[in-house]
Amino acid sequence: MQNAIDRLIDKIKEMDNPTVMGLDPTYDKLPSCIKDKYNKNLKGICEAIFEFNKELILAIKDIIPAVKINIAFYEMYGLEGMKLFEDTCKFAKENELIVIVDAKRGDIGTTAKAYSNAFLGKTEIGDIKEKIYDVDFLTVNPYMGIDSVKPFIDDCKEYGKGIFVLIKTSNPSSGELQNLKIEGGKNIYTHVAELVEKWGEDLRGKYGYSSVSAVVGATYKNELKNIRSVAKHTYFLIPGYGAQGGKAEDIALAFDENGLGGIVNASRSLMCAYKSDLWKDKFEEKDFAKATREEAIRMRNDLNNAIKNK
């Protein structure tokens, strides 16, 4: 069974692209050419979003190695939304993309195990165990310590899956907790980075990185640099590029001499490229997927140039 981070890195190397497209759809983000085709009820809205997701996946599947699906944008539509989530995961896997579920799960004991069963492991159904969602990685909250992370790590080992543990997030208020000083003068985020590096020792793959990986925001370059210095075997999922203001030259600090070390998420700037100042005059609304593809190529080139020239 191949190590999950090796699968991800193999895809990144194959496409020469350290990018993941976030699929965080809301109805207002959809072009009218899709919205007008469906009823304005829960079922119709979810059908419209699924068409949108499919078109975006088809547009980028040969140039972007992975998608990050934020489950909150599906849960808010209830049962129809969870079917949409499952269908989107399946469609992405059918098109040979690595699937990262952004759910930020965190609890202890049997609850953590239940979360892990759903996304990484298998659920007992009578005398058999069955896979529920076909995904590769899950984001995890470490605030309750190893008790809240170990069930996920155990399933990573057994089923060849991976996790991204929150270390330093890209939101403006993240420093209220994550940058606090603790005993010895360290920031909390530094201590968590050291823990994640330790937790992942048994899951390091052929490239030297572990399937116990980390979420590190693009919007805090000094923190990103500090975390890399203490978490040398930890792969980074890096949100905050594009709409949140993260710059390629800052993100490049996460990458090693082989151009590895991170995968950079963009959600709004890719999904809604057809509305952006850069592309709105070049593409009609019906060509939204083409605009996403062009933005994906621009982002790839921007990141690769920064990584090579750092």
Where are the regions that the model predicts?
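Conserved N-terminal beta1-alpha1 strand-loop-helix module at the mouth
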Residues: M1-I69, Y74-D87, F91-E96, I100, ...
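Conserved, mostly hydrophobic/aromatic
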Residues: M21, V67, D102, L138, ...
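Active-site-proximal loop/turn and secondary-structure-junction residues that shape catalytic pockets
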Residues: P25-Y27, I71-E75, R105-D107, P142-M144, ...
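Glycine-enriched alpha-helix->loop->beta-strand junction motifs that scaffold or abut catalytic
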Residues: I64, D134-D136, K157-I163, G208, ...
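Active-site-adjacent beta->alpha loops and helix N-cap segments on the catalytic face
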Residues: M76-F91, I108-A114, M144-K157, T219-I227, ...
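Conserved anion-binding
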Residues: D107-V212
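A C-terminal functional module that forms or caps the active site or interfaces directly
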Residues: A218-N265, S269-S276
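C-terminal helical cap(s) of enzyme catalytic domains, especially alpha/beta-barrels
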Residues: I251-E257, C272-K310
